[in-house]
Each structure stands twice: as structure tokens, then as C-alpha cells.
From Swiss-Prot:
Restricted to tissues in which cells are actively dividing or expanding. Mostly expressed in roots and flowers, and, to a lower extent, in stems and leaves. InterPro entries: Arv1. This is Protein ARV 1. Keywords: Endoplasmic reticulum, Lipid metabolism, Lipid transport, Membrane, Sphingolipid metabolism, Transmembrane, Transmembrane helix, Transport.
Length: 245
């Protein structure tokens, strides 16, 4: 994601510069040489608009975030990657604790230290399996072997849906919310992969689905009851919804 790697958010064509700055607060957005449209209109957008478009899975905003928003001249990409990995694992540990919290037997039978060790081992093992399987699937289905760090950075950035789990610190939600967050995480990862590889959406979904499925299966080795809790909560929520309708 060097400076020369800026992309037009509309067509994905490489552009040399996104804007010309005449004075502080006075800029002119550059046009793409391929589609003749403004290369990146998100430069002048508020962060809330960018966040909303990310939730809506718009390819334009994914190109903006993955290619144009990070300036390698001022940001250490390697440090950013490690920070994202730490945040990702931390939120994953919280997700695991939320699911275990609904399992009363596990919550009361395990000591805090033992529970922490179990959660940490489970999260690290599941995510190691996710990264390995994702790399293998990407190489096999998309023939992408030269941009592993860039692609993994994009996957961690597109996992922003995990921050919605923090809302469960304040408000009480059914455990099925975690299931919906996982689905949105899968679709967001697929969109980011499509934008970065310019492959078909079907192949990108297949890669992410394989990686997430293997991650889930490895996670079940350490806590097989979590899946039953999640599915049970989802079925309970759906039955309640249909009764209202």
C-alpha cells in the first residue's frame, strides 16, 4: 500500500494522486484516468459516513479504507498489523467469554485462572487455524501468494464488526447477536478480499467460508458446547420473532 498504490474507488484503477492541496482546507480532488470520475470522494466525507458505508458493504468505501486511507509515509504498516491482531484476539476472547457466560455449568465449575487459560488457548488455536487455512485457500482458489501481508491486513481491518460485541457490555442482547456478527464478519471479509484481489465474489466467499469454518471446527475442540448455545439462542430468538409477527 505504497503511495503509488492509490486506487480509484469507483473502478479500482491505479492513480498517482488523489488530490491537490492549494492551501490548508483548500483541495481539489483528482479524477481517475480510466473512468473519468473523482478518484476518491470519501476524502471529503465525515468518518461517520465512511463507517455507515462500510456497514452497507459498498466496494467504493472498502477501496478507500484499504488503499487510500493509510499513508505508509506516516504509518508503520507492520506495527499497525500487530495492533490489529492484538485487538482482533482481544475481541475474540471477549466473544468466547460471552458464550461461556451463558453456559452456567462452565461458568461456575472453572476457576478464573483456568477459564482464562482455556479461553486464551482456544482463541489462539482457532485463529492460527484460520490464518493458515485462509492462506492455503487464497493460494489455491485465487492464486494470491505475493501479497500475503497486505491481504491479511485487509482481513483484520474488515473485521471491524467485532467491535459491536462491546455493546453487550452496556446493553443486554440475546446470544444470537453473536451469530449475526459472525455472519457480517464473513461477508465483510469477503468484500475486502474481492476488492484487494479483484476476483469473483463467489471465490472470495468460498475462501472466507473455508477459513471461518476451519476456525469454528478447531474452536469446538476446546469448547464443544458453545455451538449448541449459539444455535439454541438463535432458534429461541427466531421463535420469539415469529410469534410477534
Amino acid at each position: 500500500m505504497a503511495a503509488s498504490e492509490h486506487r480509484c474507488v469507483g473502478c479500482g484503477f491505479r492513480v498517482k494522486s488523489l488530490f491537490i492541496q492549494y492551501s490548508p482546507g483548500n483541495i481539489r480532488l483528482m479524477k481517475c484516468g480510466n473512468c473519468k470520475e473523482v478518484a476518491d470522494e470519501y476524502i471529503e466525507c465525515e468518518r461517520m459516513i465512511i463507517f455507515i458505508d462500510l456497514i452497507l458493504h459498498r466496494p467504493k468505501v472498502y477501496r478507500h479504507v484499504l488503499y487510500n486511507a493509510i499513508n505508509p509515509a506516516t504509518v508503520n504498516i507492520q506495527h499497525l498489523l500487530w495492533k490489529l491482531v492484538f485487538a482482533y484476539l482481544l475481541l475474540d476472547c471477549y466473544r468466547s467469554l460471552l458464550l461461556r457466560k451463558s453456559d452456567e455449568e462452565s461458568s461456575f465449575s472453572d476457576s478464573p485462572v483456568l477459564l482464562s487459560i482455556k479461553v486464551l488457548i482456544g482463541v489462539l488455536s482457532a485463529n492460527a487455524a484460520f490464518i493458515i487455512s485462509f492462506a492455503i485457500a487464497t493460494k489455491g482458489l485465487l492464486n494470491e501468494v505475493s501479497r500475503r501481508r497486505e491481504i491479511m491486513l485487509g482481513i483484520f481491518i474488515s473485521s471491524y464488526f467485532k467491535i459491536f460485541l462491546l455493546a453487550m457490555l452496556v446493553w443486554e442482547f440475546p446470544m444470537s447477536v453473536i451469530f449475526f456478527v459472525d455472519i457480517l464478519l464473513l461477508t465483510s471479509n469477503s468484500m475486502a478480499l474481492k476488492v484487494m484481489t479483484e476476483s469473483t465474489m463467489t471465490r472470495c466467499i468460498a475462501v472466507c467460508l473455508i477459513a471461518h469454518l476451519i476456525r469454528f471446527l478447531v474452536g469446538q475442540i476446546f469448547e464443544p458446547t458453545i455451538f449448541l448455545i449459539q444455535i439454541g439462542s438463535l432458534l429461541q430468538y427466531m421463535s420469539y420473532f415469529f410469534r410477534i409477527v
